[in-house]
Amino acid sequence: MAYKGWNSDSFSMNSELFNEILLYAHLDSSGIDSDDLNTNPNTLENEINSVEKTLNIEELKKITTALNIDNRCNICSIINICLRHETDKMWIYDYALLCYKCNAAPRTPLAVVIIATEFMQLIQKHFLNINFDGLFLNNILSILDFHVHFFINRCFSNTNDDLLHNENITLYHMAILKSLLLEDESIPNIRIKKFKLKGKPTKKQHGNAILEKQTLPLNTHFTHLIFYMWAGTNIFDRISLTDLAIKKRQILKAIYSTKNELNCSAGPILLSQIPISITKNATSSVCLLCELMTSSQKNFDLLQFIYTSVINYCQNNLKMIDRIQFVLANLLDLARIYTNVKTTSDCSKIVLANEQEFSNSDFVIDCHSFLILKQVGPVGLYKHFFCDPLCIANIKTIKPHILFYTTESCILQDFKVAICYQNEYLNSVEKHVWLAIHFFKAFQVSKLNHKNKTLISDFLKDFTQLLADQNFEIVDPTFTIHYYV
């Protein structure tokens, strides 16, 4: 079957490749918290846990080698091997389409796992004579390699004039991730103003008519994978998914690996742009609404309908949270899915069946989207639409007409060739803006010591101005940075 990109037909909860990627997106369990160790350090149990914590830090250091600026990109190395062994151009054309889709995708855990799985499927499909087994098992690849290649450094994109400017952005971006994973007490001190002054917006140089031919909708439905990925974690703390969490744990444990006991309570957190599992004031570090809009056209349209309805709800000066509550109540009352979906018990069977659906000329809502709206509630919608710069950057980035569509079969190959030779992957959000946003998110999940408090104060002055310059319509980040995650 011809590769079309972002096609859920090639994904399932039982897929060995998909589950292997999920497995290696989990961190190992770290025993007890370091604060507990300090309370009573002399017990045998705490000594054992201290050793385990040391071993886990060593494992993290191994994983985070992908975040060293002077370390090779392992994805690029694999691509180089493939280019030397290909007998035709079919592989590179498929890879170009994958990059084209990636460029139109938001930065979400679901997007990362789709990109990683499709990349692995492509190299296995095109190079039967090369053994790609054990890439994760033998530490040749890690999940962070996909972050670096496709999202942080964007190795596939065409270069700008200032190579060292780009190098420094990548360096600082990786330093933030590394400090979070290694639980450093302080975040790297980054002056975003110098990047703001040097950053140059990319402009489209030329067009190609065939790139406008994506007119056929793909049968894309990834929503069930969201529930599978995050079942049994605090991301779904209002929705019980016990059976699904047990099924996932059994499947992952059956995969041969050298990993220790998985931290299942955090889930596949290495897929997240901010790999820290935390909840705060009815929000979580993984935004389920960003995941939802990544999953299908109908879910993207549903969120667009909710946003438009909130903005246009009435002419009175209602607060946004009140508008959201009224719109959400009206929508759920109209759909009435809640009459058949009881969220007081385990919802695993409901997720797997997904039998209830309501649609009209404005939106479609099914059991999956209903449960996610139930989980996030009005506060989650408020944070997603109006407060979180990462969510708003994702909304600006996603291009559903690229992500969820394909061309007619007769021109699909020409379409891939056009992408490859045009080699133009334009940013909706510039790299220095992504860096600043991830700096912001790092402050949200880090411990507030004296040094970090000083950094936050200086950072917010520049960050607020940067968002204004980039036309981010957003609630004052000074509120969000301390109140949500």
UniProtKB/Swiss-Prot annotation:
Positions that bind Zn(2+) 2: C287, C290, H384, C391
Compartment(s): Host cytoplasm; Host nucleus
Region (Zinc finger 2): 287-391
Region (Zinc finger 1): 73-155
Free-text function comment from the UniProt entry: Plays a role in efficient localization of neo-synthesized capsids to nuclear replication compartments, thereby controlling cleavage and packaging of virus genomic DNA.
Superkingdom as given in the UniProt entry: Viruses
GO cellular component, one term: host cell cytoplasm
Entry's Gene Ontology molecular function annotations: zinc ion binding
Family under the similarity heading: Belongs to the herpesviridae UL32 protein family.
UniProt: Zn(2+) 1 binding residues: C73, C76, H149, C155
Protein name: Packaging protein UL32
Keywords: Host cytoplasm, Host nucleus, Metal-binding, Zinc, Zinc-finger
